[in-house]
Amino acid sequence: MKITGGLLLLCTVVYFCSSSEAASLSPKKVDCSIYKKYPVVAIPCPITYLPVCGSDYITYGNECHLCTESLKSNGRVQFLHDGSC
């Protein structure tokens, strides 16, 4: 009985660990389409510092600043990952 309970517990832990790891590996997307209604020079970005790394390996202060650069570059700059580069 103890072996069955231990095995069940082990399987449960392995299942939840593998599920959360798979979820964290899914690529995050940044939706820049909400900024297209503004002229690129007048996008109202918040001053909140939540750094993101762009595909040009430049750290942007937040997703809005990344989207501004992405729109300026016609989509060449994309989201790479959260945090500093």
UniProtKB/Swiss-Prot annotation:
Cellular component, GO, one term: extracellular space
Alphabetized UniProt keyword annotations: Disulfide bond, Protease inhibitor, Secreted, Serine protease inhibitor, Signal
Record flagged with keyword Ribosomal protein: no
Alphabetical list of InterPro entries matching this protein: Kazal-type_SerProtInhib, Kazal_dom, Kazal_dom_sf
Signal peptide bounds: 1-19
Pfam family, one: Kazal_1
Gene Ontology molecular function, alphabetical: serine-type endopeptidase inhibitor activity
Coiled coil, from the record: none
Superkingdom assignment: Eukaryota
Keyword Disulfide bond: yes
GO biological process: inflammatory response; negative regulation of cytokine production involved in inflammatory response
Subcellular localization: Secreted
PROSITE patterns named among the record's database cross-references: KAZAL_1 (PS00282), KAZAL_2 (PS51465)
Disulfide bonds: C32-C67, C45-C64, C53-C85
PANTHER family with a match to the protein in the record: SERINE PROTEASE INHIBITOR KAZAL-TYPE 7 (PTHR47499:SF1), SERINE PROTEASE INHIBITOR KAZAL-TYPE 7 SPINK7 (PTHR47499)
Task performed by this protein: Probable serine protease inhibitor.
Name of this protein: Serine protease inhibitor Kazal-type 7
Source organism (scientific name): Homo sapiens
Taxonomic lineage from the root: Eukaryota, Metazoa, Chordata, Craniata, Vertebrata
